Amino acid sequence: MVVGRDGKPRCAWAGSGDGGLSRYHDEVWGKRTHDQSAMFEALTLGVFEVGLSWSIVFGKRDAFAKAFRGFDPTRIATMTARDVDRLVQDASIIRNRAKIQATVDNARAMIAASPSLGALARSYEITRKQAPRSLTELPTTTKQAEAFAKQLKAQGYRFVGPTSVYAFMQNVGVVNDHVRGCFRATN
């Protein structure tokens, strides 16, 4: 737990409240959303986080938003092999061809899928009786995330293992993993 200059206690990973990561913690992470672009952003950042650290991916968040058309799945689904080739050369993002192509494929899956990503997310909601005491109490995955990942893969999503799906669930508020004492925790 850290207390920022604004006096708000936050999860330690968010920092002191002075930068983008703290704003993300305060305004986005763990906040329930049904917005398709916000959900796709969370899914995409999770795809790029596989094998890397969150700080690396988060540091490129604005560049990803630009590269992936504001995280609008309908617009991303129209991207071509030429667009993928162009993004592989874009030094402002993580230039992993497989992850870039997975993002395009995931947009297509999201548009075609039934039930929708939002409906699936709601069906795997996790309710806690109390907030975790510390980050060490947080799981990296759950049975719900394993089942959710399996269903997403069946719908054609890629790079969606149980760990990245659990991170997605945290990000979009399907589970509230703000730690006890954080002003965003549900105690």
Model regions: which residues?
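HhH-family (HhH-GPD) DNA N-glycosylase catalytic core used in base-excision repair
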Residues: M1-N187
